[in-house]
Every structure is written in structure tokens, then in C-alpha cells.
Amino acid sequence: MRKLLAGLTVTVFVLAVGTVAFAATQTLSGQLIDQVCYKMNKSNTGVDHKMPSGDEANCAATCAKMGQPVALLTSDGKVYTVTGDLAANNNAKLVSHLSHKVELTGDVAETGGTMTIAATSLKMISK
């Protein structure tokens, strides 16, 4: 019984430490982008790129307002999907900052090779 209890205690401790290591609060800076279009074409970082059909401008804002993922593209090329409070209500708090350089603060995690930031605050750096 003591060995079982000791084993469970160690397991719980290891899991607790692992969880903290994978979800750390950080402040990241970069450009807010339309994640779907960026994956299709790395040059689609501005708000003025057109829809894939080529018939509608301002794809980034249109897609973000429909709830498509917005991401933070850092200077080293990493892409963090923005989740959490700032991405709520179809990215309402992010749309006006698309293509701008910003700082986001929130819990950063990686799941299956996808980086996310559950952003709680945004600071505009430049347009």
C-alpha cells in the first residue's frame, strides 16, 4: 500500500511539473496575420491580400470576423494561433490590429506541433 501511494504521489508530481512547463505566461511580439491564408501563401501577411478566389480584397479582416484563426507571426518565423479572451467573439478585439506589430501576453503552449497563445492583453507597437 505504501509503495502504491508513493508511486501515485510521484506520478501526480511529475504531471503537475509537466503541465506548468508547457503552459507558461509569456509576452511575445510580432505581426497579427490571417493564419489560413498565411499557410497557403507566406506572402499573405497584410490586410490587403485578396480572397483565394481573387475577387474580394481585405481577406484578413473578413476571415477574422467570420471566426477564422488569427495568428502572431514572430520575427523568427514562428506562428502562434491566438486563442483566449482576445480571440473571443470572432476576433472582435483583434480585427483592427491585423497586420500591425503587437505584443501579446498570455499562456503559451504547444500541442501536436501547433503553438498557441491564450492572449489576455495586447499592446500595439506599430502599424
State what each model feature region is.
Residues 1-12:
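Bacterial N-terminal signal peptides that target proteins for export
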Residues 13-23:
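Sec/Tat signal peptide C-region and signal peptidase I cleavage site
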Residues 23-127:
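Mature soluble domains of exported/periplasmic/lumenal proteins and thiol-rich metal-chelating peptides
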